[in-house]
Amino acid sequence: MLLINFFIAVLGVISLSPIVVARYILRRDCTTVTVLSSPESVTGSNHVQLASYEMCGSTLSASLYVYNDDYDKIVTLYYLTSSGTTGSTLALILPVWSNNWELWTLSAIAAGAVEITGASYVDSDTSVTYTTSLDLPLTTTSASVPTGTAANWRGRSIYQVVTDRFARTDGSITYSCDVTDRVYCGGSYRGIINMLDYIQGMGFTAIWISPIVENIPDDTGYGYAYHGYWMKDIFALNTNFGGADDLIALATELHNRGMYLMVDIVVNHFAFSGNHADVDYSEYFPYSSQDYFHSFCWITDYSNQTNVEECWLGDDSVPLVDVNTQLDTVKSEYQSWVKQLIANYSIDGLRIDTVKHVQMDFWAPFQEAAGIYTVGEVFDGDPSYTCPYQENLDGVLNYPVYYPVVSAFQRVGGSISSLVDMIDTLKSECIDTTLLGSFLENQDNPRFPSYTSDESLIKNAIAFTILSDGIPIIYYGQEQGLNGGNDPYNREALWPTGYSTTSTFYEYIASLNQIRNHAIYIDDTYLTYQNWVIYSDSTTIAMRKGFTGNQIITVLSNLGSSGSSYTLTLSNTGYTASSVVYEILTCTAVTVDLSGNLAVPMSGGLPRVFYPESQLVGSGICSM
C-alpha cells in the first residue's frame, strides 16, 4: 500500500500558520471522497480544511474550506512519507482575500508517488494505483480499496499461507490438526493478524491467503473444503476463516504496515459432493442453472486444449463443475464480481487458480476489470505453453523454472545445466520474467525437504527462489523446515512449531529478503534487470542481478553439506577492480582483484551472496 501523509501549509503575508496534517492512501479510480460537508469550528489559525478529493489518473482534484483573517494566503499541498521524507510539491496556489469561509476547488498533477517497502523512497512513476484512507484532525472517514499494480508488485516478497493452517484466533500452539483428517483446524484471519510481526520479521512485504468465498460445507470423500478451492457462492464468504470485518481488519493491518494482500480466487469451476450426474445447480450462486456450465465430460487428454478447457476436473467424489466462461453473461458477471470483491476487501493482488482450464481470451478483460496485479496458475513446465498466458495476465507461477530447480538441488549432483538452459529460455519465451511468481513449495506440490534433508541443498534452492527473476513466494512453514509431501501432507498446521524466530531457515530467509529489499531501495532498476548466468559447471551456477554498483551475485551449488572447501574464481561480476564486496550470509569481506575477478570461498555446499560494501553502509546488514 502507498501510505502517504499530506499536509497543507498555509503561508501568510504576515505570519506562517501551523501545518494541518491529513493521512492518506490514494487511489486513482476517479471516485470522489467527501470529507466535510461544511467547515468545522476550529481553534487558533487552523484555517484550511479539506472538503473533498478524488484521484483520477495522475490528477488530484480537491475542494478546500479556506478562512481568511485579513491577510492573503497561498495554500500549498505537499506529501510526506510515514518515515518523514518530503515528496514532491503539488502545484496548488490559492490566493485568499475574503474575511470568511470560502470553498475553493483546485486541480493538480501529482508530480510523484511514494512507495513504502520497509524504507521509504520517492518514485516518479505516477501511473500506479493508489488506495484511499483518511484520518483528519477534525473528522475521520475511510475507504479501503486496492493499490497493487504490476509495477508495484515487482518489489514485493510474498508469504503464502493456507489460512486454515497458519494461525488460530486463540493463539493455541497445541491444538491438534491431523492432516489426514482433512478437516478445518481453526486457522483464521484474526490468527494471521496476530502473527504479522512473525511474517514481517522475515522481510516479507505481502501475503497470499486462501480463497475467501463460500465453499461447499460437505464432508466429502476428500474431507472438508478447508483449503478454499471448492466454490459454492462467490458473493458470500467462507466464515470458517472469519467474517467480513475480520478480513477487512486483516487488509487494514497489512496496509498500515506497508504490506499488500493477495487473495486466491477460482473462476474455472464450482464443486459438488457426490456423483457428477447428481449435481444440484440450484445450490450455486450466481450461476444457479446448468445453462451456465459445460456439459459433463472428464478431462482425459491434456494435449487437447478444448478437452482441458471445456471438460471437468475432479472425480465422482468431488466433481469440479466446469463454468462455461465462453458465455458473455458469465464474463460480465465475473468482471463485475471481481471489481466488487477487490473494493469490498481492499485486495491488492490476485492469484488465480486453474488458469489453463479457461479459454485464454477470457483473461485480458478480466484482468482489466480487476485493475490490480494478477498471477495465474498454469500448471505446466513447458514455457512455450505457459508463457503465452502472460499476454493476458500480468504474471504466471513459474512452473517452467520450478521443475529444473527441484531437479538441480533435490540431490547431490542434480542437473545444473537444465536450470541454466531454462533461465535463458524463459527470457525469450515469456514477456516479462520479472513479473513471474518464483516459488519452491506450495499447496499443490511437495515441500522441498520431502525430497532431501540436506540443509545446504535446501538453502541453495531457497536462495534461487528469492534472488532470481520474479516475485519471490515462500510457502508458510518453509522457515520452520516443514517436510510434508503431496496433498494433504504439505498442508500442515504451523502452530506446533511455536513460530520460532530463531530457527535456521527463519533467519536465513530474513537475510535473503533483507538484501533483496535493500538492493531495491538503493535502485529499483534492480527489479527490471534480468537475472543472467555468469558462470556454471556441473555442480555450480553463479548469477548476476542488478546494474553495476547495485548488483547481487548469487553463487549456488548442489554439492550438499559434505561439499569440500575450495575457491571459485568468477569474472563477469561487474564489480570494480580492487573494490570490496561482502558475502552477506557469512558477513565476510572479499576484495575484487586487479582484473575484476571475484574469489568466492566455497564450503559445505552453502550458497554465497555478494553485494558492494559501499552500498551497505547504514543498511544494518552485516552490522554496516
Curated annotation (Swiss-Prot):
The protein's required cofactors: Ca(2+)
Chief location: secreted
Chain ranges of the CBM21 domain: 40-133
Compartments in which it is found: Secreted
Residues bearing attached sugar chains per UniProt: 304, 344
Record's cofactor remark: Binds 2 calcium ions per subunit. Calcium is inhibitory at high concentrations.
Signal peptide: 1-28
Keyword Zinc attached: no
InterPro entries membership: A-amylase-like (IPR013777), A_amylase_C_dom (IPR015340), CBM21_dom (IPR005036), Glyco_hydro_13_cat_dom (IPR006047), Glyco_hydro_b (IPR013780), Glycoside_hydrolase_SF (IPR017853)
Entry's EC annotation: 3.2.1.1
Statement: the UniProt record of this protein carries the keyword Metal-binding: yes
Protein name: Alpha-amylase 1
Gene that produces this protein: LKA1
